Amino acid sequence: CLSRGLGDVYKRQIFYGVMVATSVTQEKSNRTIEVLVTSADTKILFFGKVLAGTIASLCQAGILMLAIVGAYKFNQSAWGGMLDMLLDIPANVLVTYALFGLGGVLFYTFIYGAFGALVSKTEDINKSAGSIQMVIMIVYFITLFQLMNIDGIAMKVLSYLPISSYSAMFARVAMGNVAVWEVVVSFIILVASIIGVGMIGSSIYRMGTLRYGNPIKIATAIKSLRKQKNK
């Protein structure tokens, strides 16, 4: 169950992240963005795209979960109670999974959206955002490998880093003994990081959407933002 939960978040991060990045790039390639930025604030546009993708992810997950539970309840006798353990998952594990899973999707979707603004063609998205997918994949496998040492120092460090806390803290709560304050601190760090990444991402979105041609490197985009800030 734990590995499936981690895998579900992993798939949603990539699927909806790429979806948002593709949407941003398509608007840029067909010049729709030029009309949008004249009628709405770029921060609202950017945050709206990311939140829409996240809400779509939540709706899909909710419908799927209701369908699974409903189907199992309807045919529970046929299963012979084989999956009753799924209905007995502790509330703290479910809440941690929901909050940190949502945070993880938001965190990386903001990053994907920013990277989508750095390219002008949809075929360049994988090249530009490939590093994000690599980070998500590395975090996923490291977390799986560390399940055998759930209370080790590596897992504790991962549970506080925003790039990995969504999976590491959930795993620690599900398999180990974690103090409430640890979960709260980790979640506060994740929320603060989401806000920070969202603000930086919206600035990159504003700058990148009106620049056409070759893909813009993320380092170049950050340098441009620093120059604009210092003016």
Regions found by a protein language model. Name each.
Residues 126-157:
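Transmembrane helix segments
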Residues 7-18:
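Long, hydrophobic alpha-helical segments
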Residues 145-160, 164-192, 231:
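Membrane-interfacial helix-loop-helix junctions in multi-pass membrane proteins
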